[in-house]
Amino acid sequence: MTKDGDEGSKSGVSRRKFLGSAAVGVATAGIASQLLTLSAPAEAAVKTNVGPSRAGVGYDVIVIGGGFAGVTAAREASRSGLKTLILEGRSRLGGRTFTSKLQNQKVELGGTWVHWTQPNVWTEIMHYGLEVEETVGLANPETVIWVTEDNVKRAPAAEAFEIFGSACNEYYKEARNIYPRPFEPFFERKKLQHVDGLSAADYLEKLPLTREQKDMMDSWLSGNGHNYPETIAYSEIMRWFALSNFNMPTMFDSIARYKIKTGTHSLLEAIMADGNSEVKLSTPVTKVNQDKDKVTVTTEDGVFTASAVIVAVPINTLHDIEYSPKLSAAKVDMGSQRHAGAGVKGYIRVKQNVGNVMTYAPARNKLTPFTSVFTDHVDESGTLLIAFSADPKLIDINDIKAVEKALQPLLPGVEVTASYGYDWNLDPFSKGTWCTYRPNQTTRYLTELQKREGRLFFAGSDMANGWRGFIDGAIENGREVGHQVATYLKRENDNA
């Protein structure tokens, strides 16, 4: 929403209603979307698509879901010579990434940051010659503001990080024992099993830290998991740290410093153009029926057949499709439990130059709903901030007056001219934000989520071994599954 009071409509969870609503375009005064439909290279790819490798089916592979995992899997399958179709429920590709604009400035409403510790996405960025730019506030702030025991403190970053850094050293001390090889999550299975039932809050409360340190850590944990710390698995927090080479400065840089200069949509478009897949947008899948020879996919507008199907939808929406035969009990259980990621992310334009700041506040405090706010950049118009909250019920990020009030304890006197976010919980094709496992979900479900079921393969950032919940995890898993499908169908055709 912008200062003049225009606001986009909100969407419910009906998939057909969602497709017809203004929320898909998210077009409001001062706010514009960059929807990745089909670029010219991708259109050309559709026109040159080959026929299926065997009779009796319309396609070799159907990919359900056009996020980074689905698009990457489709690229791998199509480059193996397989006729591939992507069915995407939304009117755009991109999944839980969404490049948009706020007052003529590019913003990322979903997945944003990349780093060379994330080998899959970084390889793609280099391969396609994309550039990155920096977000200055989280990784390299000048001033830190934090809430502890419902009081606000402010100090130079070096001073604040002495307090926070010693708390992190204590919190992360077991990470290397649990995840010595972070891309092999079960390398130390017994050690992981021993701690996987703990929540991030459970572990924090038993540590010999001051209340101030625990309040800062609570903010950090909420920001990582995008929910209250008691809903987040302690093992998830350890995983991020392990993937960041067991180093806090590297972790700051890995999770919120570097972003693609031309937007995440530019990487997705490059991957699409490099494949040879057909795409059908605004095509929600309702049923998937597999038999001995093929898979039949029913949408709200038609029926398609293939030799294999890659289901590349978020875990929280897995159960919205009817499967015959039914999916394994583990997949059904995980889908009904849902992952924990469900918080708020928003961009806030303030009139003042507040400098390069970072704020911390525990998820449950009496002063502000924001667990963290940090500077994206400062320019002649003021400051663009990025804000997070653990709970969407606490703040409407598109309500300027509410956002301005929520910022006052942290940044007294700031005037908000625009505030903009996207509620991924209301989006029927995501029903949540980035994937964060709850206690016990890694050891109970991760391996089962990755397993093929007949002609059905499963892909997504939500089931990646490494940077789960990140663009890197989506590409990791999408590439692997695309290769698996190509190998499976080649073997089947060779034996026919």
From Swiss-Prot:
Annotated compartments: Periplasm
Induction: Expression is up-regulated in the presence of nicotine.
Single GO MF annotation: oxidoreductase activity
Transmembrane annotation, as ranges: none
Signal peptide start-end: 1-42
Alphabetized InterPro entries for the sequence: Amino_oxidase, FAD/NAD-bd_sf, Flavin_amine_oxidase, Flavin_MAO, TAT_signal, TAT_signal_bac_arc
Stored Pfam families: Amino_oxidase
GO cellular-component term (any): periplasmic space
EC code: 1.4.2.3
Catalysed reaction, written as an equation: pseudooxynicotine + 2 Fe(III)-[cytochrome c] + H2O = 4-oxo-4-(pyridin-3-yl)butanal + methylamine + 2 Fe(II)-[cytochrome c] + 2 H(+)
pH dependence: Optimum pH is 8.5.
Record's keyword terms, sorted: Alkaloid metabolism, FAD, Flavoprotein, Oxidoreductase, Periplasm, Signal
Positions bound to FAD: A69, E88, R96, W113, V285, S461, I471
Main subcellular location of this protein, as a coarse class: periplasm
Cofactor(s) of this protein: FAD
Cofactor stoichiometry and binding remark: Binds 1 FAD per subunit.
SUPFAM superfamilies: FAD/NAD(P)-binding domain
Disruption phenotype: Deletion mutant can degrade nicotine, but it cannot further degrade N-methylmyosime and use nicotine as the sole carbon and nitrogen source.
Activity regulation field: Strongly inhibited by Na(2)MoO(4) and FeCl(3). Activity is nearly twice as high in the presence of Na(2)WO(4).
Family to which this protein belongs: Belongs to the flavin monoamine oxidase family.
Function summary: Involved in nicotine degradation. Catalyzes the deamination of pseudooxynicotine to 3-succinoylsemialdehyde-pyridine. Functions as a dehydrogenase that uses the c-type cytochrome protein CycN as the physiological electron acceptor. O(2) is a poor electron acceptor. Pnao is oxidized by CycN 230 times faster than O(2) at equivalent oxidant concentrations.
PANTHER family linked to this entry: AMINE OXIDASE, AMINE OXIDASE [FLAVIN-CONTAINING] B
Quaternary assembly: Homodimer.
Protein name listed in UniProt: Pseudooxynicotine dehydrogenase
Higher taxonomy: Bacteria, Pseudomonadati, Pseudomonadota, Gammaproteobacteria, Pseudomonadales
Gene label: pnao
